[in-house]
Amino acid sequence: MPNIKSQIKRVKTNEKSRQRNKAVKSALRTYVRNFRRAAEAGDVEAATKAARVANRQLDKAASKGVIHKNQAANRKSAISKKLNSLAA
């Protein structure tokens, strides 16, 4: 446990950030999973809606610094690729 006042606060804020980031990442996995399920079922309309939600959440997470912007871009690209192959 740190002795310096600023470091004590840092430990608290880091823990808050960790919990928040963990929740956001968990939600991201859920949104992507929902898209994959819709895509595997062959439901183009549901997959399109799920892809829109997943892409929006990925962008939000990247802008907040939870995930790197390139990781968000790669995931969005994979979602788009799968959606396009489904529609074709």
Curated annotation (Swiss-Prot):
Gene3D superfamilies: Ribosomal protein S20
Lineage top rank: taxon: Bacteria
Disulfide bridges in this chain: none
Molecular function in Gene Ontology: small ribosomal subunit rRNA binding; structural constituent of ribosome
Region (Disordered): 1-25, 68-88
Keyword vocabulary terms for this entry: Ribonucleoprotein, Ribosomal protein, RNA-binding, rRNA-binding
GO CC annotation terms, alphabetical: cytosol; small ribosomal subunit
Any one biological process term the GO annotation gives: translation
Family: Belongs to the bacterial ribosomal protein bS20 family.
Function: Binds directly to 16S ribosomal RNA.
Protein's name according to its UniProt entry: Small ribosomal subunit protein bS20
Organism field: Cutibacterium acnes (strain DSM 16379 / KPA171202)
